[in-house]
Amino acid sequence: MPALKIPLFKMKDMVLILCLLKMSSAVPAFPRQPGTPGVASLSLETMRQLGSLQGLNMLSQYSRFGFGKSFNSLWMHGLLPPHSSFQWMRPREHETQQYEYSLPVHPPPLPSQPSLQPQQPGQKPFLQPTVVTSIQNPVQKGVPQPPIYQGHPPLQQVEGPMVQQQVAPSEKPPEAELPGLDFADPQDPSMFPIARLISQGPVPQDKPSPLYPGMFYMSYGANQLNSPARLGILSSEEMAGGRGGPLAYGAMFPGFGGMRPNLGGMPPNSAKGGDFTLEFDSPAAGTKGPEKGEGGAEGSPVAEANTADPESPALFSEVASGVLGGLLANPKGKIPNLARGPAGRSRGPPGVTPADADPLMTPGLADAYETYGADETTTLGLQEEMTMDSTATPYSEHTSMPGNKAQQPQIKRDAWRFQEP
């Protein structure tokens, strides 16, 4: 008896342990928010807050940890501070740009000026202007000019003061905000940015705003496959589903590979990234149509044409003229074997609604294609090129099954794939 009980006991333990392991692998360690599996899931509010930060507009792929490392996704979730929070992590071009352009520093002395320095000790405020003298400079401008031109060659003299007088008025508006910056002399230029940052406090951003204000960039370590390069346009709430999310948890923990969509995640989106999607031009047409829930059962022309005659060209003409707008389809009235109405429009077999009631028809393209008269004919080559034979749709074997209702969504989707002529 004890020999029988021990294996049962061990079996129970093993089953329990296996169940716990399965549960621990199925329940994600990090709670999944609904969103695209491979993309860092950010809500719209978080995206707008992050997009307003100046520091995230840089290309964060070039991080301190090397190219394309996964540490950048930690910035997205706020686990690491953003770039703009530390002065020493701020990119170098802020300092140099303000040092050179927005706060104009005095230009280097011209080659003619050092010869003037020992001759005229009275001119030293012009040659080494500190912040204080440059503020007083416009006041003194009228006073020292008459003695300048006495007894000196005019060319050298004109060069020196003219440059300084051009610089001084442009300096005065920015420098007037910082009156006491004598320790930040341009004679010690390595100290100058640090001293200016300390004395000035937070630097006002007088940079022009970046070219694409709403975008910031994210890098994905392994996921060059399907993920977008920018998140500023769409948040991950709005994106269509990517191919099962190559970087969700399978990249970090290989145990999570197969069971990603099971528990706690959204079901994988049926419109995979590899498939095509339809874009409707008019907002009215985007709300209707068989894709948007009007279904084949409610009398859309696709279903009726299919029940009437599975191989009738009206199926292709209705769908193609509605969705592709007639660009690849027959123009109206040019469908062979169909009776024409008085206006030259195809009446079709009796079960088919006329093409004006087609919910997918874009209004602008419908008007453009009314212009064919009743008696016009297209040339033979064009008509042969545009008729819907079995070479035009590689998936048309679905349409030849007469009563197969299960294939109808497949028909609707696949009838719009045309080969290039």
From Swiss-Prot:
GO MF annotations, alphabetized: growth factor activity; structural constituent of tooth enamel
Top-rank lineage group of the source organism: Eukaryota
Tissues in which the protein is found: Ameloblast-specific. Located at the Tomes processes of secretory ameloblasts and in the sheath space between rod-interrod enamel.
Main location as per UniProt: secreted
Gene Ontology CC terms, in alphabetical order: extracellular region
Keyword Glycoprotein: yes
Subcellular localization, as worded in the UniProt entry: Secreted, Extracellular space, Extracellular matrix
Keyword annotations: Biomineralization, Extracellular matrix, Glycoprotein, Hydroxylation, Phosphoprotein, Secreted, Signal
Sugar-modified residues: 112
Region called Disordered, residue ranges: 104-126, 264-311, 333-421
Pfam families from the UniProt entry: Amelin
The keyword Phosphoprotein is assigned to this record: yes
Record PTM Phosphoserine, positions in chain: 43
Biased composition (Low complexity): 113-125, 339-350
Basic and acidic residues bias (residue ranges): 411-421
UniProt biased composition (Polar residues): 388-410
InterPro entries with a match to the protein in the record: Amelin
Signal peptide: 1-26
Record-listed Hydroxyproline modification sites: 37
Similarity remark: Belongs to the ameloblastin family.
PANTHER family: AMELOBLASTIN
Role: Involved in the mineralization and structural organization of enamel.
The protein's name: Ameloblastin
Lineage summary: Eukaryota, Metazoa, Chordata, Craniata, Vertebrata
